[in-house]
Amino acid sequence: MTDRKKLLRSLDGEVQKVPPIWMMRQAGRYLPEYRATRAEAGDFLSLCYNSELAAEVTLQPIRRYGFDAAILFADILLIPDALGADLWFVTGEGPRLSTIETMEEFNKLKPADEVHDHLAPIYETVRILSRELPAETALIGFAGAPWTVATYMIAGRGTPDQAPAHKLMREAPEVFDALMDRLTEATIAYLSMQIEAGAETVKIFDSWAGSLKGEAFTKYALEPTKKIIAALKTKHPDTPIIAFPREAGDGYIGFAKATGADCVALDNSVSAAWAAEHVQVDGCVQGNLASSHMVTGGQALVDETREIVQAFSKGPHIFNLGHGITPDADPENVQLMIDTVRSA
């Protein structure tokens, strides 16, 4: 019997009868204890930068559910904040940022290696969690991928089709490429410090990768992820890395080999059976239950969960949702999912 944590064993390539389980956004508004702590912090950004409270909300779903991993509570837009972009959150609408559309605006950003003072509270959160998590619980750090973060910085907000970023890519490629390079370097620096602070694995979230097609997907989703992973592996060769090019479709095929990722996370737009045949052949996969099941529950949740576990049973697998859990989820449905996975 090994004492290596279940999540890390899957990332090592081990096939486990009962896969490790955690959820994207497992610390979130669906939990009453999270809502209470967020109210104490005052606002979302204050919660991210308050190391003690950020650690507390990270620990809450571990106490309640006993997940096999905790993911650092933070936000993908902390890097632009640290680079000097203005960032604020509008209640009910989400993030707002100062826009980067010209070289003059880009040149106001800080160099990538100057983000650490601003992000010091995040590293302290990681250190607290390293001390306080149960011995069997793995700690996941994370960052947004350069493309996804760039879409917010260019538009100044989330957009349904990422049109402003695509427009800048075509009309001012020198500005777009400079921003992508800056974000790539800042992401390397940020994740490396998370690992040094105690993160046992890190995940790169490319939430809008699916809006890139063909050569653009290769250049702006795959290649930056590859560069980040190569830099991290040079400095931290024993730290496994999870990549999530959400809604990549056929782009999931070969993504692990092309980027050097130890695991590819899958959204629920691809079936588990398809992914087992085309993606899991290269190693560990993570996913991919539709988050809507956390709202509706019932036998459909049980059946789909069992189907996913079975589909991925012949290779290394981490059970997760295909996207983050939503605020309207029922905490009891989360427990039902966990019980189903662990009794599979």
Swiss-Prot record:
Q: Which Gene Ontology BP terms does the record give?
A: protoporphyrinogen IX biosynthetic process from glutamate
Q: Does the keyword Chloroplast apply?
A: no
Give me the Gene Ontology terms describing cellular component. Answer: cytosol
- UniProt keyword Glycosyltransferase present: no
- Kindly give the Gene3D superfamilies that the UniProt entry links to this protein: 3.20.20.210
Name of protein: Uroporphyrinogen decarboxylase
Q: Name one GO molecular function term.
A: uroporphyrinogen decarboxylase activity
Question: For binding substrate, which residues are annotated in this chain's numbering?
Answer: R25, Q26, A27, G28, R29, D75, Y152, S207, H323
Q: What is its EC number?
A: 4.1.1.37
Source species, domain of life: Bacteria
What are the residue positions of the site described as Transition state stabilizer?
Answer: D75
Gene responsible for this protein: hemE
Q: Which InterPro entries match?
A: UROD/MetE-like_sf, Uroporphyrinogen_deCO2ase_HemE, Uroporphyrinogen_deCOase
Per UniProt, subunit arrangement is: Homodimer.
**What's the family?**
Belongs to the uroporphyrinogen decarboxylase family.
Keywords of the record, alphabetical order, are: Cytoplasm, Decarboxylase, Lyase, Porphyrin biosynthesis
Catalysed transformations (reactions): uroporphyrinogen III + 4 H(+) = coproporphyrinogen III + 4 CO2
Pathway linked to the protein? Porphyrin-containing compound metabolism; protoporphyrin-IX biosynthesis; coproporphyrinogen-III from 5-aminolevulinate: step 4/4
Protein function: Catalyzes the decarboxylation of four acetate groups of uroporphyrinogen-III to yield coproporphyrinogen-III.
User: What subcellular locations does the record give?
Assistant: Cytoplasm
